[in-house]
Amino acid sequence: MTFRELINEVLIRLREETIATDWSGNINDSSTVTDYQKVIGSLINDSKRNVESYHDWLVLRETKAITTVSGTRNYNLSSGQEIKLIDVTNQATGGKLVQVSRQYINSTLYPTENTGEPMYYAFNGADSDSNLKVDLEPKPDSIQTISFDIVKFQDELKTASTKLKIPTKPVVLGAWARAVSERGEDGGTNTGVIAMEVSESINQAVILDSGNVQYESEWYVK
């Protein structure tokens, strides 16, 4: 469902005028979208972020790969800031890298640095675009590819045709609940009923998505 369609789903529930055609560019810069419709757009994004944080949604998962350089410890994930790491694998060996603290990484630097195949990683800063960086330990001494499987929130919806990645129902209901709360009344559905519908829709969506990753908690011996 597109951003415009999501906004209209909420507007219909509020018995407000819907947006007939796609606007151009960022919704907040549009002269064809009313101020109230823009408010609903903001509430859609608030609800989206809330639902995204409930669960490691499959549609939000992706892999970031870095290629090591001999003698270089710090690498940019080019991932943005709001991510969760699921798994880190050395493609050359199949070995899993374990997350450790910055204190541990610091303890390995003296009196001399370790070099070799990376076995550990720790977050260490970000670039000017808020992309997170990691340090590898031992410091690589050859070219290898390290895969980082992550969960990454979708950017805020701004353009009319941008499609929502996660399940739509809990996002729409969540935005509706926020809109009713924002203006204090709805003249229809009780706010308690809406809140209950929001909770139930999120639970159902999580149950369905979790069924496709039910083996993630199991361990396999190679």
Regions found by a protein language model. Name each.
Residues 1-222:
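Glycine-enriched, solvent-exposed interface loops adjoining structured elements
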